Curated annotation (Swiss-Prot):
Transmembrane segments: none annotated. InterPro entries: Snake_3FTx, Snake_toxin-like_sf, Snake_toxin_con_site, Toxin_cobra-type. It comes from Naja haje haje. GO terms for molecular function: toxin activity. Belongs to the three-finger toxin family. Short-chain subfamily. Orphan group VI sub-subfamily. GO terms for cellular component: extracellular region. Expressed by the venom gland. Disulfide bonds join C3-C21, C14-C37, C41-C53, C54-C59. Keywords: Disulfide bond, Secreted, Toxin. Gene3D superfamilies: CD59 (2.10.60.10). This is Weak toxin CM-2. Pfam families: Toxin_cobra-type. It is found in: Secreted.
Length: 61
């Protein structure tokens, strides 16, 4: 299973058990964006502008 990760923003193989890709962005002036692999989707927080969780290779591009 592969997902895009930050800070490199390249597709990488996820560790065993982490079969969800995610992307989240903050409500900040800089528009910080984090991408990677997780075992379960993080909970949405009010400081997030955007949260995506998906189960298809590289779906968080």
């Amino acid at each position: 299973f592969t997902c895009f990760t930050t800070p490199s923003d390249t597709s990488e193989t996820c560790p065993d058990g982490q079969n969800i890709c995610y992307e989240k962005r903050w409500n900040s002036h800089q528009g910080v964006e984090i991408k990677g692999c997780v075992a379960s989707c993080p909970e949405f927080e009010s400081r997030f502008r955007y949260l995506l969780c998906c189960r298809i290779d590289n779906c968080n591009k």
